[in-house]
Amino acid sequence: MNLKSPLFLRLSDRLDVYIRLMRADKPIGTLLLLWPTYWALWLASDGIPDLAVLAAFTIGTFLMRSAGCVINDFADRDFDGAVERTKNRPFAQGRVKKKEALLLTAFLCLLAALCLIPLNHLTWLMSLPALFLALTYPFTKRFFPIPQFYLGFAFSFGIPMAFAAVGNSVPVEAWILFAANVLWTLAYDTVYAMADKEDDLKIGIKTSAVTFGRYDIAAVMLCHGGFTLLMAVLGAVIGAAWAYWTAIPIVLLLQYRQYAAIKSRVRQICFETFLANNRIGWVWFAAIFAHTFFAK
Protein backbone atom coordinates (compact mmCIF):
# COMPACT_ATOMS: atom_id res chain seq x y z
CA MET A 1 0.00 0.00 0.00
CA ASN A 2 1.21 3.46 -0.91
CA LEU A 3 1.24 5.32 2.42
CA LYS A 4 1.35 8.66 0.63
CA SER A 5 -1.59 8.04 -1.69
CA PRO A 6 -4.53 10.48 -1.39
CA LEU A 7 -6.87 7.62 -0.43
CA PHE A 8 -4.64 6.41 2.39
CA LEU A 9 -4.10 9.94 3.69
CA ARG A 10 -7.85 10.57 3.60
CA LEU A 11 -8.62 7.35 5.48
CA SER A 12 -5.89 8.09 8.00
CA ASP A 13 -7.30 11.56 8.61
CA ARG A 14 -10.85 10.24 9.09
CA LEU A 15 -9.62 7.55 11.48
CA ASP A 16 -7.80 10.16 13.55
CA VAL A 17 -10.91 12.35 13.66
CA TYR A 18 -13.17 9.46 14.69
CA ILE A 19 -10.78 8.28 17.41
CA ARG A 20 -10.66 11.79 18.84
CA LEU A 21 -14.43 12.24 18.61
CA MET A 22 -14.95 8.93 20.41
CA ARG A 23 -12.19 9.71 22.97
CA ALA A 24 -10.86 6.23 22.22
CA ASP A 25 -7.44 7.64 23.05
CA LYS A 26 -8.68 8.74 26.50
CA PRO A 27 -10.06 5.69 28.34
CA ILE A 28 -10.85 7.41 31.66
CA GLY A 29 -14.51 7.95 30.74
CA THR A 30 -14.96 4.30 29.82
CA LEU A 31 -13.31 3.21 33.07
CA LEU A 32 -15.54 5.47 35.18
CA LEU A 33 -18.54 3.89 33.44
CA LEU A 34 -17.22 0.35 33.72
CA TRP A 35 -16.40 0.31 37.43
CA PRO A 36 -19.98 0.70 38.70
CA THR A 37 -21.19 -1.70 36.02
CA TYR A 38 -18.64 -4.26 37.22
CA TRP A 39 -19.62 -3.63 40.85
CA ALA A 40 -23.19 -4.50 39.90
CA LEU A 41 -22.28 -7.54 37.79
CA TRP A 42 -20.13 -9.05 40.53
CA LEU A 43 -22.74 -8.42 43.24
CA ALA A 44 -25.63 -9.72 41.12
CA SER A 45 -23.76 -12.88 40.11
CA ASP A 46 -22.17 -13.59 43.51
CA GLY A 47 -18.75 -13.07 41.99
CA ILE A 48 -19.13 -15.35 38.97
CA PRO A 49 -20.50 -13.30 36.06
CA ASP A 50 -21.34 -15.11 32.85
CA LEU A 51 -18.61 -14.39 30.31
CA ALA A 52 -21.08 -13.52 27.55
CA VAL A 53 -22.83 -11.03 29.83
CA LEU A 54 -19.51 -9.59 30.98
CA ALA A 55 -18.35 -9.17 27.38
CA ALA A 56 -21.67 -7.61 26.33
CA PHE A 57 -21.49 -4.98 29.07
CA THR A 58 -17.81 -4.26 28.56
CA ILE A 59 -18.10 -3.74 24.81
CA GLY A 60 -21.46 -2.00 25.10
CA THR A 61 -20.11 0.43 27.69
CA PHE A 62 -17.19 1.37 25.46
CA LEU A 63 -19.48 1.90 22.46
CA MET A 64 -22.06 3.97 24.35
CA ARG A 65 -19.41 6.09 26.01
CA SER A 66 -17.97 6.69 22.54
CA ALA A 67 -21.39 7.61 21.16
CA GLY A 68 -21.93 9.96 24.09
CA CYS A 69 -18.63 11.71 23.39
CA VAL A 70 -19.48 12.19 19.72
CA ILE A 71 -22.92 13.65 20.43
CA ASN A 72 -21.37 15.80 23.16
CA ASP A 73 -18.97 17.35 20.66
CA PHE A 74 -21.85 17.83 18.23
CA ALA A 75 -23.85 19.66 20.91
CA ASP A 76 -20.87 21.79 21.98
CA ARG A 77 -19.57 22.50 18.48
CA ASP A 78 -20.21 26.26 18.79
CA PHE A 79 -18.53 26.52 22.20
CA ASP A 80 -15.51 24.20 22.22
CA GLY A 81 -13.32 26.64 20.32
CA ALA A 82 -13.65 29.15 23.17
CA VAL A 83 -12.59 26.69 25.88
CA GLU A 84 -8.90 26.11 26.48
CA ARG A 85 -9.23 22.36 27.12
CA THR A 86 -11.44 21.68 24.09
CA LYS A 87 -10.17 24.13 21.47
CA ASN A 88 -8.32 21.36 19.59
CA ARG A 89 -11.28 19.00 19.24
CA PRO A 90 -12.30 18.06 15.66
CA PHE A 91 -15.38 20.30 15.52
CA ALA A 92 -13.46 23.28 16.90
CA GLN A 93 -10.82 22.74 14.20
CA GLY A 94 -13.39 22.35 11.41
CA ARG A 95 -12.31 18.78 10.66
CA VAL A 96 -15.73 17.14 10.84
CA LYS A 97 -19.21 17.89 9.53
CA LYS A 98 -22.43 17.71 11.55
CA LYS A 99 -23.92 14.95 9.41
CA GLU A 100 -20.76 12.89 9.72
CA ALA A 101 -20.84 13.10 13.53
CA LEU A 102 -24.53 12.17 13.67
CA LEU A 103 -23.96 9.16 11.41
CA LEU A 104 -21.05 8.03 13.59
CA THR A 105 -23.25 8.36 16.70
CA ALA A 106 -25.99 6.28 15.08
CA PHE A 107 -23.49 3.64 13.96
CA LEU A 108 -22.01 3.33 17.46
CA CYS A 109 -25.49 3.06 19.00
CA LEU A 110 -26.37 0.32 16.51
CA LEU A 111 -23.25 -1.63 17.44
CA ALA A 112 -24.10 -1.18 21.12
CA ALA A 113 -27.61 -2.50 20.45
CA LEU A 114 -26.09 -5.68 19.03
CA CYS A 115 -24.48 -6.26 22.43
CA LEU A 116 -27.99 -6.68 23.86
CA ILE A 117 -28.66 -9.81 21.79
CA PRO A 118 -27.46 -12.33 24.42
CA LEU A 119 -29.32 -10.49 27.23
CA ASN A 120 -32.91 -10.83 28.44
CA HIS A 121 -35.93 -8.70 27.56
CA LEU A 122 -35.87 -6.70 30.81
CA THR A 123 -32.36 -5.54 29.99
CA TRP A 124 -33.49 -4.56 26.50
CA LEU A 125 -36.29 -2.45 27.97
CA MET A 126 -33.95 -0.76 30.43
CA SER A 127 -31.57 0.12 27.61
CA LEU A 128 -34.14 2.58 26.21
CA PRO A 129 -34.01 5.14 29.05
CA ALA A 130 -30.25 4.56 29.22
CA LEU A 131 -29.94 5.51 25.55
CA PHE A 132 -32.16 8.56 26.00
CA LEU A 133 -30.12 9.83 28.95
CA ALA A 134 -26.80 9.28 27.17
CA LEU A 135 -27.84 11.16 24.02
CA THR A 136 -29.64 14.06 25.71
CA TYR A 137 -27.14 14.87 28.47
CA PRO A 138 -24.96 17.21 26.35
CA PHE A 139 -27.95 19.45 25.61
CA THR A 140 -28.86 19.92 29.29
CA LYS A 141 -25.89 22.28 29.62
CA ARG A 142 -28.04 24.89 27.84
CA PHE A 143 -30.78 25.11 30.49
CA PHE A 144 -30.24 22.80 33.51
CA PRO A 145 -28.17 24.39 36.32
CA ILE A 146 -26.61 21.09 37.40
CA PRO A 147 -26.19 18.95 34.26
CA GLN A 148 -23.69 16.75 36.12
CA PHE A 149 -26.62 15.44 38.18
CA TYR A 150 -28.33 14.39 34.95
CA LEU A 151 -25.06 12.80 33.83
CA GLY A 152 -25.06 10.83 37.08
CA PHE A 153 -28.26 9.09 36.00
CA ALA A 154 -26.84 8.41 32.54
CA PHE A 155 -23.62 7.00 34.01
CA SER A 156 -25.50 4.84 36.53
CA PHE A 157 -27.96 3.02 34.28
CA GLY A 158 -25.51 0.19 33.70
CA ILE A 159 -26.14 -0.82 37.33
CA PRO A 160 -29.84 -1.79 37.13
CA MET A 161 -29.21 -3.17 33.65
CA ALA A 162 -26.51 -5.46 35.05
CA PHE A 163 -28.79 -6.74 37.81
CA ALA A 164 -31.57 -7.23 35.26
CA ALA A 165 -29.25 -9.15 32.93
CA VAL A 166 -28.10 -11.50 35.69
CA GLY A 167 -31.26 -12.06 37.73
CA ASN A 168 -34.08 -10.72 35.54
CA SER A 169 -35.00 -8.32 38.36
CA VAL A 170 -33.73 -5.11 39.92
CA PRO A 171 -33.53 -5.54 43.73
CA VAL A 172 -33.21 -2.77 46.31
CA GLU A 173 -29.41 -3.08 46.48
CA ALA A 174 -29.25 -2.13 42.79
CA TRP A 175 -31.01 1.16 43.50
CA ILE A 176 -28.83 1.90 46.52
CA LEU A 177 -25.78 1.39 44.30
CA PHE A 178 -27.46 3.50 41.61
CA ALA A 179 -27.97 6.41 44.03
CA ALA A 180 -24.41 6.08 45.33
CA ASN A 181 -23.01 6.26 41.82
CA VAL A 182 -25.11 9.32 40.96
CA LEU A 183 -23.44 11.14 43.86
CA TRP A 184 -19.98 9.89 42.89
CA THR A 185 -20.50 11.04 39.30
CA LEU A 186 -21.72 14.44 40.49
CA ALA A 187 -18.60 14.72 42.67
CA TYR A 188 -15.97 13.85 40.08
CA ASP A 189 -17.64 15.62 37.16
CA THR A 190 -17.97 18.80 39.20
CA VAL A 191 -14.21 18.63 39.71
CA TYR A 192 -13.91 18.14 35.94
CA ALA A 193 -16.11 21.20 35.39
CA MET A 194 -13.97 23.24 37.80
CA ALA A 195 -11.14 22.94 35.27
CA ASP A 196 -13.28 24.78 32.69
CA LYS A 197 -15.10 27.12 35.07
CA GLU A 198 -13.59 30.39 33.85
CA ASP A 199 -14.28 29.57 30.20
CA ASP A 200 -17.81 28.32 30.92
CA LEU A 201 -18.67 31.55 32.74
CA LYS A 202 -17.59 33.55 29.69
CA ILE A 203 -19.60 31.58 27.14
CA GLY A 204 -22.67 30.96 29.30
CA ILE A 205 -22.53 27.17 29.61
CA LYS A 206 -24.26 25.81 32.72
CA THR A 207 -22.30 23.40 34.93
CA SER A 208 -22.42 22.34 38.56
CA ALA A 209 -19.13 24.15 39.16
CA VAL A 210 -20.68 27.39 37.90
CA THR A 211 -23.94 26.87 39.82
CA PHE A 212 -22.27 25.98 43.13
CA GLY A 213 -19.98 29.00 42.78
CA ARG A 214 -17.63 29.43 45.74
CA TYR A 215 -19.24 26.42 47.39
CA ASP A 216 -18.08 24.07 44.62
CA ILE A 217 -15.50 22.28 46.78
CA ALA A 218 -17.98 21.86 49.63
CA ALA A 219 -20.49 20.38 47.17
CA VAL A 220 -17.89 17.96 45.81
CA MET A 221 -16.98 16.71 49.27
CA LEU A 222 -20.62 16.47 50.34
CA CYS A 223 -21.30 14.26 47.31
CA HIS A 224 -18.23 12.15 48.03
CA GLY A 225 -19.41 11.74 51.62
CA GLY A 226 -22.91 10.76 50.52
CA PHE A 227 -21.45 8.27 48.05
CA THR A 228 -19.35 6.57 50.73
CA LEU A 229 -22.27 6.57 53.18
CA LEU A 230 -24.52 4.85 50.64
CA MET A 231 -21.81 2.27 49.90
CA ALA A 232 -21.78 1.55 53.64
CA VAL A 233 -25.58 1.21 53.60
CA LEU A 234 -25.23 -1.18 50.66
CA GLY A 235 -22.72 -3.22 52.64
CA ALA A 236 -25.18 -3.50 55.52
CA VAL A 237 -28.04 -4.51 53.21
CA ILE A 238 -26.06 -7.29 51.51
CA GLY A 239 -24.43 -8.46 54.75
CA ALA A 240 -21.00 -7.70 53.32
CA ALA A 241 -17.97 -9.74 54.30
CA TRP A 242 -15.19 -8.04 56.27
CA ALA A 243 -13.16 -7.46 53.10
CA TYR A 244 -15.82 -5.11 51.75
CA TRP A 245 -15.43 -2.74 54.68
CA THR A 246 -11.70 -2.30 54.15
CA ALA A 247 -12.51 -0.07 51.17
CA ILE A 248 -14.08 2.66 53.28
CA PRO A 249 -10.95 3.99 55.05
CA ILE A 250 -8.97 3.74 51.80
CA VAL A 251 -11.62 5.66 49.87
CA LEU A 252 -11.92 8.28 52.61
CA LEU A 253 -8.17 8.83 52.38
CA LEU A 254 -8.36 9.17 48.59
CA GLN A 255 -11.24 11.63 48.95
CA TYR A 256 -9.29 13.71 51.47
CA ARG A 257 -6.36 13.84 49.06
CA GLN A 258 -8.73 15.12 46.38
CA TYR A 259 -9.96 17.81 48.75
CA ALA A 260 -6.41 18.90 49.51
CA ALA A 261 -5.65 19.06 45.78
CA ILE A 262 -8.68 20.99 44.51
CA LYS A 263 -8.47 23.69 47.18
CA SER A 264 -6.07 25.47 44.84
CA ARG A 265 -8.69 25.46 42.05
CA VAL A 266 -5.81 25.31 39.57
CA ARG A 267 -7.11 24.09 36.19
CA GLN A 268 -4.55 21.30 35.64
CA ILE A 269 -4.75 20.09 39.25
CA CYS A 270 -8.54 19.86 39.02
CA PHE A 271 -8.24 17.81 35.83
CA GLU A 272 -5.67 15.47 37.40
CA THR A 273 -7.91 15.09 40.45
CA PHE A 274 -10.78 14.11 38.19
CA LEU A 275 -8.58 11.39 36.66
CA ALA A 276 -7.69 10.15 40.15
CA ASN A 277 -11.27 8.95 40.66
CA ASN A 278 -10.34 5.86 38.70
CA ARG A 279 -8.57 4.72 41.89
CA ILE A 280 -11.78 4.95 43.87
CA GLY A 281 -13.49 2.84 41.21
CA TRP A 282 -10.99 0.01 41.35
CA VAL A 283 -10.75 0.10 45.16
CA TRP A 284 -14.48 -0.52 45.41
CA PHE A 285 -14.29 -3.20 42.74
CA ALA A 286 -11.53 -4.95 44.67
CA ALA A 287 -13.64 -4.75 47.83
CA ILE A 288 -16.73 -6.17 46.13
CA PHE A 289 -14.67 -8.88 44.45
CA ALA A 290 -13.19 -9.82 47.84
CA HIS A 291 -16.64 -9.75 49.44
CA THR A 292 -18.05 -12.21 46.91
CA PHE A 293 -15.02 -14.46 47.45
CA PHE A 294 -15.11 -14.54 51.24
CA ALA A 295 -18.91 -14.63 51.49
CA LYS A 296 -19.03 -18.05 49.80
From Swiss-Prot:
Keywords annotated in UniProt: Cell inner membrane, Cell membrane, Magnesium, Membrane, Transferase, Transmembrane, Transmembrane helix, Ubiquinone biosynthesis
Family, similarity comment: Belongs to the UbiA prenyltransferase family.
This protein's GO CC annotations: plasma membrane
Keyword Coiled coil: no
Catalytic activity reported: all-trans-octaprenyl diphosphate + 4-hydroxybenzoate = 4-hydroxy-3-(all-trans-octaprenyl)benzoate + diphosphate
GO-annotated molecular function: 4-hydroxybenzoate polyprenyltransferase activity
Free-text function comment from the UniProt entry: Catalyzes the prenylation of para-hydroxybenzoate (PHB) with an all-trans polyprenyl group. Mediates the second step in the final reaction sequence of ubiquinone-8 (UQ-8) biosynthesis, which is the condensation of the polyisoprenoid side chain with PHB, generating the first membrane-bound Q intermediate 3-octaprenyl-4-hydroxybenzoate.
GO biological process: ubiquinone biosynthetic process
Bilayer disposition of the protein: Multi-pass membrane protein
Name of this protein: 4-hydroxybenzoate octaprenyltransferase
Recorded metabolic or biological pathway in which this protein acts: Cofactor biosynthesis; ubiquinone biosynthesis
Major localization listed first in the record, in broad terms: membrane
PROSITE patterns recorded: UBIA (PS00943)
